[in-house]
Curated annotation (Swiss-Prot):
Protein name: Cortactin-binding protein 2
Intervals holding ANK repeats: 700-730, 734-763, 767-796, 800-829, 833-862, 903-933
Gene name as annotated: CTTNBP2
Functional description taken from the UniProt entry: Regulates the dendritic spine distribution of CTTN/cortactin in hippocampal neurons, and thus controls dendritic spinogenesis and dendritic spine maintenance. Associates with the striatin-interacting phosphatase and kinase (STRIPAK) core complex to regulate dendritic spine distribution of the STRIPAK complex in hippocampal neurons.
Molecular-function annotations in GO: protein phosphatase 2A binding
Lineage: superkingdom: Eukaryota
Family matches, as InterPro entries: Ankyrin_rpt, Ankyrin_rpt-contain_sf, Cortactin-Actin_Reg, Cortactin-binding_p2_N
SMART domains according to UniProt: ANK
Species per Swiss-Prot/TrEMBL record: Eulemur macaco macaco
Amino acid sequence: MATDGASCEPDASRAPEEAAGATAEAARKEFDVDTLSKSELRMLLSVMEGELEARDLVIEALRARRKEVFIQERYGRFNLNDPFLALQRDYEAGAGDKEKKPVCTNPLSILEAVMAHCRKMQERMSTQLAAAESRQKKLEMEKLQLQALEQEHKKLAARLEEERGKNKQVVLMLVKECKQLSGKVIEEAQKLEEVMAKLEEEKKKTNELEEELSAEKRRSTEMEAQMEKQLSEFDTEREQLRAKLNREEAHTTDLKEEIDKMKKMIEQLKRGSDSKPSLSLPRKTKDRRSVSISVGTEGPLTRSVACQTDLAVESTEHVKKSPLTVPVKPSPGSAKGSVGANAALVRPGIDRQASHGDLIGASLPTVPPASANRIEENGPSTGSPPDLTSSAAQSPAAAPHGLPPAHGSQSGSQSPCASAPPHSAPPHPGLNPRVQAARFRFQGNANDPDQNGNTTQSPPSRDVSPTSRDNLVAKQLARNTVTQALSRFTSPPVGAAPRPGASPTGDVGAHPPVGRTSLKTPGVARVDRGNPPPIPPKKPGLSQTPSPPHPQLKVIMDSSRASNAGAKVDNKTVASSPPSSLPQGNRVISEENLPKSSSPQLPPKPSIDLTVAPAGCAVSALATSQVGAWPAETPGLNQPACSGSSLVIPTTTAFRSSINPVSASSCRPGASDSLLVTASGWSPSLTPLLMSGGPAPLAGRPTLLQQAAAQGNVTLLSMLLNEEGLDINYSCEDGHSALYSAAKNGHTDCVRLLLNAEAQVNAADKNGFTPLCAAAAQGHFECVELLIAYDAHINHAADGGQTPLYLACKNGNKECIKLLLEAGTDRSVKTRDGWTPVHAAVDTGNVDSLKLLMYHGAPAHGNSLNEEEPESDASDLDEGEESSEGKSKPVVPADLINHADREGWTAAHIAASKGFKNCLEILCRHRGLEPERRDKCNRTVHDVATDDCKHLLENLNALKIPLRISVGEIQPGNYGSNDFECENTICALHIRKQTSWDDFSKAVSQALTNHFQAISSDGWWSLEDTAFNNTADSDIGLSTSSVRAIMLGSVPWSAGQSLAQSPWDFMRKTKAEQVTVLLSGPQEGCLSSVTYTSMIPLQMLQNYLRLVEQYHNVIFHGPEGSLQDYIVHQLALCLKHRQMAAGFSCEIVSAEVDAGFSKEQLVDLFISSACLIPVKQSPVKKKIIIILENLEKSSLSELLGDFLAPLEIRSTESPCTFQKGNGLSECYYFHENCFLMGTIAKACLQGPDLLVQQHFRWVQLRWDGEPMQGLLQRFLRRKLVNKFRGQMPSPCDPVCKTIAWALSVWRQLNSCLARLGTPEALLGPKYFLPCPVVPGHAQATVKWMSKLWNAVIAPRVQEAILSRASVKRQPGFGQTTTKKHPSQGQQAVVKAALSILLNKAVLHGCPLPRAELDQHTADFKGGSFPLSLVSNYNSCSKKKESGAWRKVNTSPRRKSGRFSSPTWNKPDLSNEGIKNKTISQLNCNKNASLSKQKSLENDLSLMLNLDQSLSLGSDDEADLVRELQSMCSSKSESDISKIADSRDDLRTFDSSGNNPAFSATANNPRMPVSQKEVSPLSSHQTTECSNNKSKTEPGVSRVKSFLPVPRSKVTQCSQNTKRSSSSSNTRQIEINNNSKEENWNLHKNEHIEKLNK
């Protein structure tokens, strides 16, 4: 019930609320809040609050009610007092219903479940508690451990602190020790340096000792050689004495035989027999005597055994007129005598040759030996020049009895006795005429002409005399008999068989004939190739020599054949050396061994005058063979020598003589005047000549043919070729044919003979080499040309694949290469190793050969096959363009250039690995070259190249871009800038593909730095050396910071800037042809471009600008041509832009001052330009720059006198009043914004102009001080660098010498003009800036100098000297102040001064040769004045000085302690002239004059009286000297009338003594002279010294040399001197105590005077 009631309560409570709400709504419709009163509002508020509280209460009641309803619904069924009972009752009441379930869960089960849960939770909590306890225990353990660790940490920290303290102490100790050790190290280093210095000294001493020891060793070896020489000479003398003994024995036996024969003759005469035998017997007996004594009759007095002799007249007449009949076999005595003589004389010669390899001394005094291998033709090898002179001296006495001395000692045929002692004299004067006849008969026929030099083109004439043919066999039998006897003992020892065609010594000489031959130079008788030899005279009477039996025959050897007629041995050729004349006019050939050059040049052929004995041929002609000689009765070349007969070539060539004995054709009596008889086909006597009886048979014909071809014996070869059945193609063991041997040795005539005889032209040896191969390899281009003409196979390859072209390239034979290429040979033939001719040419490094291979046959506008490689002179900008090979395309294909051998190496690999840069450069010019081609070891050309070649390869594809410096627009020419250049090329930049912008920027910066250093350095060293030699003093202040911008073509670029493309691609794409560097100029407020243009250091220009900005009034003055106008205008321009950059407006006003420029015009200029403003007007802000040019043309004091104070104090406090044109005057003043600059072309101020000096700031441009002193040198250096495209030529280059000469001319001119006391004639460097720089043409510079001299220098000097001579004269002599027309004396002075200046300052040091210089001297005005009027040149003949220019010292020279030097007291005059003068007081008494006499004879002594004025008298020469003296040293007047003419040499000058300026200093003459003194402005007393002995020329008065006196010659004199009487030798001078003398010393080197002695 309660529930029901409870549930009804809410409904009951809602009803009144709803009723109240309904009434409220009804009331609200009529209710208006705004109309309520305050109390009503309060009541309303309270009602509403109560309503809210009621609402809260209702809410709470509703909540409680709902809670009760829930509980009732949930638990209302049960009795709360006994819930279990109620449940049981309810259960039991419904027990019948089995399916009935409890209403809710049993509370007991719920409790059990709760208890179970609680137990689980308890267990879980217990486990967690146990775990927590264990964790707690662990934590406590860890805490304990942590505490222990902390304790240990504290202990360790304490230890660490202790250790740190200890370490600090150790470190301090170590620092102290280091300091001590460093000190010790320094000490040890010093000691080491000392020890090293001592070591260097010891090394020097050791080196000196080594040099001394080596010198001693050389001396000892020389002494040893001399001893050996003497021993050999003693052996020779011993053998000669033995020979003499043998000859005496033989002579005895001959005399016995003659006695017997004479007895028989007497018997025959008694019997009345026929007279013919009686006529022939005396001749025969004479000849027999001659034979028996024919070998070595000279003994120790002659050099040659088989020497040509001149017979006595009787003997020679017999020889000429009668035929000679000789028995076939000689008598035993004769043979024995000959054997003994030869045996005695052969051995010492050979021994001596073995001990002295250089037996080739000069036997002709007029022919100095060219080398140790020189071969003397006419006799001994070891002879000395005195032999000839001694022989010539004894010739008159020796001629009647023996041979002429020249023949005896110099022109004998080759003999074993060629090594005679040096003291050889003519043969024994007492020799029997029969001995001479015998010598002539069997030896003298060595005069027969040599056959080597003749061609077979024209058969010579032959003697058809029947007598000669009939008697040929008999004479030859006789001679061959003697030959057999002689040849036994003139041969080498048995078993020493020589190589065929060569001598044991490896040198085969060409032997000219013996007889009256004369030496001539090769050029005299040289004929063009192909000319036939001239036909010789047939008559003996044509001989022009005094010896009757020797008709002279002149044979001109063909100039086309090589003179090395022998076989080539050891790669040496025989060349002709310059011959000389013998006393009797005999001509021989001298030859020398020359090393084989890479491109052989065959020497010209000498001409030989051959004299032939008509009576027959000499024994020695066959017994002593040579190159081209024909050995008679000798075994074959390859057979060993035997006792009976042997080859004699080793004996003759062992002495390296080059006497040509006669070969076979001249062995006929009738063929004495025919050289190539058998060449014409007629040789009737060949068989008896070759096969005459003897102990050994002759060798086979083929061997003899090869020997003749190898030796170049044309005559023997022609005879052999005329034989029938001879195999001319026979080959020896090596496969060498006769044609091969002749071609290999360069015997063109033999080659032509063999080819005409149809020899096989392509016959190859066992290695496959043809004659063409041999000739090409040896460089015999004439043989090559001949073989090619006879269709030789030009592309024949030997067994190794070598073609003639390959062999010629391998040996560098340029002419042969050219001939083969012209013949169309194949360049691409490869050897077995894969090498081509290009490989061979590159392997030897022969540039000419490679050029021929590359370019020969190219279509040619630029084909220069035979031209030299263009010199890498100036720069590499145009290397490829300037070289002519670059203009023509190579003819070889790319495949041939890139062909690789078996190792994979191309020609470029070979050239690069061997460092042949020139060859590699030529190869690189071929566009098909593949430098990246790799060999079999995978190496490129760059990998195997040397450093130089690597650099070349790296630059192969590099772009060469010229780098130029531009200074922009140069101001108009009236500013003095006509000679300046806007752009200068400084170098070439190599831009490669891998070049980065950083590299490019560094290269530009480095090039600029090098260039600035190069042009500012003092010397002529190269650009690479400037970094080491440049000093701060010579630096002009330019660097990379001076660059305003850089233009790559037309694209601007700044240093360090990186573009998208690489520099290489950028340059190629934009087609930039140059890189231009723009320097900062006045437009940027900088002066860098002005510095570079004018070469004035930047620091000095900045100082000038600072002076202008600071002082506002600056005047620049210096000699004319000192660039004052240019400097002023550039400074004004820079100042203007600076002011404009600062925000001011600025204007430049320029005015040229002339003689008519007045002060009123200047006032108008100042006022119109707002520089002068009225006092009432406020100052203007505008900047005005006034430039007054050429102020020297007006008086400064008159022009600027009224402006001095206002200019110095620029304010209204110092006004100046000027009258206007309307007559009114007004006050003006100069404001602070006005700058005044002026220029004066004058070296110094004078007179009233000095009053202006203190009111201006002056900039003096001295010619001998910076910036003018080094300006010209720097400017010309820059000009030279620009001319040579950025490169600095070598100091020894002629261009550098020319530039140095032009520079010295300017300096010496100014130096001499300053000494002359004419500062108004001084020249600035501007006149010399246009000096032409023309490489290789110094004449252009000399011509330019002559024009400058005539147009500028000479007129200025003339005007200055005349102005000096026309200054006011003293009134007592009636002289006018000026002279419109100079007198003759003054004209002479001008001419003399011009001549002296020209010779001493201009022509001195000229790089032209003296001959060319003499031609140009006439172009100089005043150069023809005779210096003998001024100086005495007679001593030149004694001193040998007539052609030498005297040197001039232009540099300031300090005073020596031995000269007395007064101090000048004129400070205002310290700005001009030479800084130092040597002022000396001379004691001119007799002894002093004598001591100075020589120096006064040689030099121009300008010792002058400067207080006393000189006058011109009637004598022009005296006037000239005196006036020139006053000109050269004095600023004072040289009065003409002061000096009277005196006949004697005594000239006395009185000291004026009235000059107060020098009165104080005269008493102290040893006071030092200031370096800034100006001696030309001072006054001195003139001292003259001369010598009477030196006469110049007839008609000229005695005028002494007034050239500069060396200081070493000047005698210091005492101050107190007395007048001495004049003598014939000296002029005595009276000198006062107060007089001063000046010595003008122009010698730069005083040792010249010593040389003149």
